[in-house]
């Protein structure tokens, strides 16, 4: 059959250009990526042949072979895995199905060191072949397909690709790389074997190369017999003392396609009523598309060394950054994704590894604060999801949280709740916090004034998830969690008798004027009262203890969510009795000026709080009216 010519989709063209011109210094990854693809193809066949043994075509000696030909200047990576149909070849090699590709390409900066890190987080897979090859040929036949229905794919990465139907005796895929002249040094046994041992030694499939013998003069002879050149015992089944740190790191890079080392790993063997082996990794950095909700995540599930699937059910969503494998002997080989969603063994494994991960993070936080801080900076926001999502582990997760505070000095989130408690003032039984859009907005919020004056530390929460998190985190270690922008603030125990008496006197003096202000603002506020929060600013707005904060209301509106009846409550206006503007208002006889100043005190408090101003122009006109 004659060949058909195709063009690459736009994203592939861009990615190919990027790979060829930006990754030349990381050329070694091509073999890791091709071996990884072959391994995946074999694992798919292993799994599918459980229910359809005919797919094996009487060949169950699964292997990946690496050959090189100095005369032809080629390297060939072949496997006897599942193979591909013509449609799959066009889809897998001519388009990029991976979501987030466009965003990834747009995020590149032009700085090669930064871009290489991004590329590593993205994973370039098959296209890394073009780092070392100026032409790539793929010959493949799907398992179970007729020998005459195989497919050949050819591309030079410049002019699209061609596809034609060919005959191929054996199922599986072979990738033939026509090596560029500047990379001909790769055409050596010791070089290719070295790359296998460096990047793919722990792969769960035999990687084979033709035997090489040397005579007494060091002359090399390549035999026709193949030998296994990797350690085929799965790394997660080996004991910890058999595995070097380098092997752990290379296996992480193999399964994650990350260029950077893992931050830490957890290697565990569980025996008893439930038996499984696990090797879990926590990366150093979050991938560029980490917040993409459509992105797949999950651990690789094996049953007795047979890869089953990437499975989300093995991890709670708030631990989706964890990479690794679980190998269980307590599941059937023909288990389906639907069965896994309601499987008691999976539920038990999930519970156990969740507990283990949280325990290891606690140890890390205690033993290596700098390393834990790196983890927190990358994954702290997603870990916070667990406070609301995982009630049984809420206290453990809360102990891992880190925050900026009024005493930490900057926006870096370094303070734990235990740290906060250890610094509480004598007589303090409440953990105080404030939520806001940004660190500066939180740190400069007028409602902190009384706390700062009394030396009471306040946690500054500025992540979008914090409001949701704090709706369920109401106490920690027996201490009540209190938002300083909700309800009354009782700081009387830290006040002198003189100040208490002074406030009571002011409350009586202002009783009449507060009622008058409330009447003026009756459609806009729930109440007007004197503030125990303010020392320098004239006014602030709060909500009652059970109301939705103005910050939360704003976020919901921005997300296009409507309020249920009673949710979007009117604020409470608090006034500083000692401020000149409030004193002026108290003594103002002109009803128009009185109304204007009342409105102004409310609007500026709303503005500082970041709340929505319904009519910004009216606010500006009001300010301009009283500028002297």
Swiss-Prot record:
Subcellular location: Cytoplasm
Membrane spanning stretches: none
Keywords: ATP-binding, Chaperone, Cytoplasm, Nucleotide-binding, Stress response
Domain of life: Bacteria
Annotated spans, A: 1-337
Principal place of residence: cytoplasm
Residues covered by region (B): 338-554
Coiled-coil annotated spans: none
GO CC field: cytoplasm
Family matches, as InterPro entries: HATPase_C_sf, Heat_shock_protein_90_CS, HSP90_C, Hsp90_fam, Hsp90_N, Ribosomal_Su5_D2-typ_SF
Annotated family: Belongs to the heat shock protein 90 family.
Subunit relationships: Homodimer.
Biological role: Molecular chaperone. Has ATPase activity.
Protein name (database record): Chaperone protein HtpG
Organism, as annotated: Francisella tularensis subsp. tularensis (strain SCHU S4 / Schu 4)
């Amino acid at each position: 059959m004659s060949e058909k010519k195709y063009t690459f989709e736009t994203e592939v063209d861009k990615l190919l250009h990027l790979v060829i011109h930006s990754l030349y210094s990381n050329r070694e990854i091509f073999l890791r990526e091709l071996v990884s693809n072959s391994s995946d193809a074999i694992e798919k066949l292993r799994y599918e042949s459980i229910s359809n043994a005919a797919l094996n075509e009487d060949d169950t000696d699964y292997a990946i072979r690496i050959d090189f030909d100095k005369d032809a200047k080629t390297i060939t990576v072949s496997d006897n895995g599942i193979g591909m149909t013509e449609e799959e070849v066009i889809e897998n090699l001519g388009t990029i199905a991976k979501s987030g590709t466009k965003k990834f390409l747009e995020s590149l900066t032009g700085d090669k060191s930064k871009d290489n890190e991004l590329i590593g987080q993205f994973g370039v897979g098959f296209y890394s072949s073009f780092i070392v090859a100026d032409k790539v040929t793929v010959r493949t036949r799907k398992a179970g397909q007729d020998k005459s229905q195989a497919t050949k794919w050819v591309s030079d990465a410049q002019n699209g690709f061609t596809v034609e139907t060919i005959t191929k005796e054996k199922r599986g895929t072979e990738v033939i790389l026509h090596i560029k002249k500047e990379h001909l040094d790769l055409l050596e046994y010791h070089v290719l074997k070295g790359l296998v041992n460096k990047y793919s030694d722990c792969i769960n499939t035999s990687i084979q190369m033709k035997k090489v013998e040397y005579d007494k003069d060091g002359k090399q002879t390549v035999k026709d017999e193949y030998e296994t050149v990797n350690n085929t015992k799965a790394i997660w089944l080996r004991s910890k003392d058999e595995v070097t740190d380098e092997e752990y790191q290379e296996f992480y890079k193999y399964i994650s396609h990350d260029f950077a080392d893992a931050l830490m790993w957890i290697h565990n063997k569980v025996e008893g009523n439930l038996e499984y082996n696990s090797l879990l990794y926590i990366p150093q950095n979050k991938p560029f598309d980490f917040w993409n909700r459509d992105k797949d995540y999950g651990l690789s599930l094996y049953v007795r060394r047979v890869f089953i699937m990437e499975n989300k059910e093995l991890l709670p969503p708030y631990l989706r950054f964890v990479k690794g494998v679980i190998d269980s002997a307590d599941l059937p080989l023909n288990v389906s994704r639907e069965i896994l969603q309601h499987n008691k063994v999976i539920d038990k494994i999930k519970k156990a590894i969740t507990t283990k991960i949280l325990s290891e993070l606690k140890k890390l936080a205690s033993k290596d604060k700098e390393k834990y801080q790196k983890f927190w900076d990358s994954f702290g926001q997603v870990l916070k999801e667990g406070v609301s999502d995982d009630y049984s582990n809420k206290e453990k997760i809360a102990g891992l949280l880190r925050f900026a505070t009024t005493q930490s000095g900057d926006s870096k989130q370094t303070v734990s709740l235990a740290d906060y408690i250890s610094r509480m003032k004598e007589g303090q039984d409440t953990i105080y916090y404030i939520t806001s859009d940004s660190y500066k907005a939180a740190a400069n919020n007028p409602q902190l004034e009384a706390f700062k004056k009394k030396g009471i530390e306040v946690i500054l929460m500025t992540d979008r998830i914090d409001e949701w998190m704090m709706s369920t985190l109401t106490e920690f270690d027996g201490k009540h969690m209190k938002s300083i922008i909700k309800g009354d603030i009782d700081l009387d125990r830290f006040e002198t008798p003189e100040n208490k008496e002074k406030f009571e006197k002011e409350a009586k003096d202002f009783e009449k004027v507060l009622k008058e202000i409330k009447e003026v603002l009756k459609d806009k506020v729930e109440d007007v009262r004197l503030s125990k929060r303010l020392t320098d600013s004239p006014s602030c707005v709060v909500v009652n203890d059970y109301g939705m904060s103005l910050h939360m209301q704003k976020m919901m509106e921005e997300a296009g969510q409507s309020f249920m009846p009673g949710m979007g409550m009117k604020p409470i206006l608090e006034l500083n009795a000692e401020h000149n503007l409030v004193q002026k208002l108290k003594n103002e006889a002109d009803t128009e000026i009185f109304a204007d100043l009342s409105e102004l005190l409310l609007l500026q408090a709303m503005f500082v709080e970041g709340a929505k101003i319904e009519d910004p122009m009216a606010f500006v006109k009001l300010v301009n009216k009283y500028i002297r």
